[in-house]
């Protein structure tokens, strides 16, 4: 009898992607985060769907509809907090996944990498519009400040901002369209994720050594399915612990105050996962310059394959590059901390230095270190 798994048109696709897929025998736990991101996406879509059933995208009722979900809907509180903290988990997994790609040279699969950067931008856009929906103080002012940055675009800026707002300020029209975007974007992300996997399966996975492993492959199932299930269980445990013990740990207390256009919060700041980019934005005194630096801080990822000067793909045998990589991680953590601090004396200069170091590391120091390491190979 012919195995239906290998012949059925639909089952065959699933089989080739998740069961009989040849995978390198030496990939470590850092390769778990791709499947965890898929799990994050499913969690967010499901919890988001149930929230959307009870949420009303209207300035007069949005805040109270979220309160209604938490108080009156059966298990509404846990759905709401799973969704909010699920977003944080999503970004933790995303940043680790990107870090893994940088460390082990996975960016050399250029199509996969570029679609990954596009996915990152999409997830960031989704998280931003989603943060506006509860219509608390930080939702309103975050939306006002971030959308206002577009006014820095010469000539069309002001018109563009008013077009996005649907009026002369962030109001009912803005909230309604942000809800529409927040609903549609995850499905676009799902489609892009399939394309991301499609390109990955054209080349096969990279591995920690960065050396082709075609002569030493093992089937994905059962070896990596069991490993992914362990990762998924640890992920679920972390998410549930965060949600049930300290659901507001990563949120902003200001968002428990209904949006008030007449009262500005003392410190306007986005969610923690955007703070590094926010710190880069704030470190440049010029509006247009800040916006360009903000964009470049993410889009610089597209340039990374072009900046590859090393003869080795992975950083596993490159001590100088390793040192610079971990300096970059520390720098991003510093920027995240600075982004959450008020704009005053010690923080301003620290933020500016950290921003300069961020671009310097990626554009100059890492390629230079790779060239030095190439020379050392000849010794």
From Swiss-Prot:
Q: Which residues cross the membrane?
A: 33-53, 77-98, 113-133, 178-198, 226-246, 288-308, 320-340, 347-367
Main subcellular location of this protein, as a coarse class:
mitochondrion
| List of residues binding heme b b566 | 97, 196
The alphabetical list of record keywords is: Electron transport, Heme, Iron, Membrane, Metal-binding, Mitochondrion, Mitochondrion inner membrane, Respiratory chain, Transmembrane, Transmembrane helix, Transport, Ubiquinone
What GO MF terms are annotated?
A: metal ion binding; ubiquinol-cytochrome-c reductase activity
Q: Alphabetically, which GO biological process terms does the record hold?
A: mitochondrial electron transport, ubiquinol to cytochrome c
Gene3D superfamilies xrefs: Cytochrome Bc1 Complex, Chain C
Cofactor(s) demanded: heme b
The entry marks the following residues as binding a ubiquinone, namely 201
| Membrane-topology annotation of the record | Multi-pass membrane protein
Cite the binding residues for heme b b562: 83, 182
Q: Cross-referenced InterPro entries, in alphabetical order? A: Cyt_b/b6_C, Cyt_b/b6_C_sf, Cyt_b/b6_N, Cytb/b6-like_sf, Cytochrome_b, Cytochrome_b_C_euk/bac, Cytochrome_b_N_euk/bac, Di-haem_cyt_TM
**How the cofactor binds, per note?**
Binds 2 heme b groups non-covalently.
- GO CC, one annotated term: respiratory chain complex III
The cellular location(s) given in this protein's UniProt record come to:
Mitochondrion inner membrane
- Biological function: Component of the ubiquinol-cytochrome c reductase complex (complex III or cytochrome b-c1 complex) that is part of the mitochondrial respiratory chain. The b-c1 complex mediates electron transfer from ubiquinol to cytochrome c. Contributes to the generation of a proton gradient across the mitochondrial membrane that is then used for ATP synthesis.
Describe the family membership recorded for this protein in Swiss-Prot or TrEMBL: Belongs to the cytochrome b family.
Other observations noted: Heme 1 (or BL or b562) is low-potential and absorbs at about 562 nm, and heme 2 (or BH or b566) is high-potential and absorbs at about 566 nm.
This protein's assembly is summarised as: The cytochrome bc1 complex contains 11 subunits: 3 respiratory subunits (MT-CYB, CYC1 and UQCRFS1), 2 core proteins (UQCRC1 and UQCRC2) and 6 low-molecular weight proteins (UQCRH/QCR6, UQCRB/QCR7, UQCRQ/QCR8, UQCR10/QCR9, UQCR11/QCR10 and a cleavage product of UQCRFS1). This cytochrome bc1 complex then forms a dimer.
The protein in question is named: Cytochrome b
Q: What is the lineage of its organism?
A: Eukaryota, Metazoa, Chordata, Craniata, Vertebrata
């Amino acid at each position: 009898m012919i195995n239906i798994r290998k012949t059925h048109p639909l089952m065959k696709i699933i089989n080739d992607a998740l069961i009989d897929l040849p995978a390198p025998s030496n990939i470590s736990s850092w390769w778990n985060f791709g499947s965890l991101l898929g799990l994050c996406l499913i969690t967010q879509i499901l919890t988001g769907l149930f929230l959307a059933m009870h949420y009303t995208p209207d300035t007069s009722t949005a805040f109270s509809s979220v309160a209604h979900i938490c108080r009156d809907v059966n298990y509404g509180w846990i759905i709401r907090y799973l969704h909010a903290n699920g977003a944080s988990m999503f970004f933790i997994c995303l940043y680790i996944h990107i870090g893994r790609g940088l460390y082990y040279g996975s960016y050399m699969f250029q199509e996969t990498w570029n679609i990954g950067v596009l996915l990152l931008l999409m997830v960031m856009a989704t998280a931003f519009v989603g943060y506006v929906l509860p219509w608390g103080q930080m939702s309103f002012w975050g939306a006002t400040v971030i959308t206002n940055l577009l006014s820095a675009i010469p000539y069309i800026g002001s018109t563009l901002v008013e077009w996005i707002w649907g009026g002369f300020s962030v109001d009912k029209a803005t909230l309604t369209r942000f809800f529409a975007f927040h609903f549609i974007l995850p499905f676009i992300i799902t489609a892009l994720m399939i394309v991301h996997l499609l390109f990955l399966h054209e080349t096969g996975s990279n591995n920690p050594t960065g050396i082709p492993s075609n002569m030493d492959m093992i089937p994905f199932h059962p070896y990596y399915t069991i490993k992914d299930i362990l990762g998924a269980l640890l992920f679920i445990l972390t998410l549930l612990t965060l949600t049930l013990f300290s659901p507001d740990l990563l949120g902003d207390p200001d968002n428990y105050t209904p949006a008030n256009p007449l009262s500005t919060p003392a410190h306007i700041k986005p969610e923690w996962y955007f703070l590094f980019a926010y710190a880069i934005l704030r470190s440049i005194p010029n509006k247009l310059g800040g916006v360009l630096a903000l964009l470049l801080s993410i889009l610089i990822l597209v340039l990374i394959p072009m900046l590859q000067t090393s003869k080795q793909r992975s950083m596993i045998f490159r001590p100088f590059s390793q040192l610079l990589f971990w300096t970059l991680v520390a720098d991003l953590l510093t920027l995240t901390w600075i982004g959450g601090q008020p704009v005053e004396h010690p923080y301003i200069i620290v933020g500016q230095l950290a921003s300069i170091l961020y671009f310097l590391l990626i554009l100059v120091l890492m390629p230079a270190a790779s060239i030095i390491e190439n020379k050392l190979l000849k010794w």
